[in-house]
């Protein structure tokens, strides 16, 4: 069984962050200001909570500057210092055309070695307190995704970086996808 270790039994809050798409060199000061505000907001609701970063954390796939590595490292550490932090891969965090290449998040997470930082890289079921997180990995095909009916527990949340069929943009445009609800 895959377990996201937390110190509480019932999950109350999920602070959801996604598609940050931090650039190699641009707007880093602006990102830092926004991250500081984010840390302060999370601290207000940190009891029985986790941060979930839903992919596309970096922008440039596997092309990374030292500045980007530094900013990602600080972001992950600062969040994990506040609450358990769960991350998944987005299509901008890896090279989907070359599965032999390492994604850009793995070396950072591995080197931080933070007990509160959880990188859920693979499709699977991950128990976190009273919740079953079902991860659908960006490298997998939709036929390999685990269905909710096949997962035990009362609360099941799919962690997925991609389009779900019939999603709509803020302008009402429908986004097609093979992934159905």
What are these regions (language model features)?
Residues 1-75, 151-152:
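N-terminal active-site segment of His-dependent metallophosphoesterases
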């Amino acid at each position: 069984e895959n377990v996201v270790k937390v110190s509480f039994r019932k999950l109350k809050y999920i602070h959801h962050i996604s598609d940050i798409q931090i650039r190699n060199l641009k707007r880093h000061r602006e990102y830092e200001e926004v991250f500081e505000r984010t840390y302060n907001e999370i601290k207000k609701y940190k009891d029985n909570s986790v941060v979930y970063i839903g992919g596309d954390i970096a922008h440039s796939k596997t092309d990374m500057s030292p500045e980007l590595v530094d900013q990602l490292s600080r972001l992950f550490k600062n969040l994990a210092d506040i609450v358990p932090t769960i991350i998944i891969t987005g299509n901008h965090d890896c090279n989907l055309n070359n599965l032999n290449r390492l994604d850009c998040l793995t070396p950072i997470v591995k080197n931080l070695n933070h007990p509160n930082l959880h990188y859920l890289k693979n499709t699977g079921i991950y128990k976190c307190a009273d919740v079953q997180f079902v991860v659908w990995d960006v490298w997998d095909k939709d036929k390999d995704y685990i269905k909710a009916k096949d997962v035990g527990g009362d609360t099941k949340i799919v962690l997925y970086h991609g389009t779900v069929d019939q999603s709509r943009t803020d302008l009402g445009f429908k986004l097609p996808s093979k992934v159905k609800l």
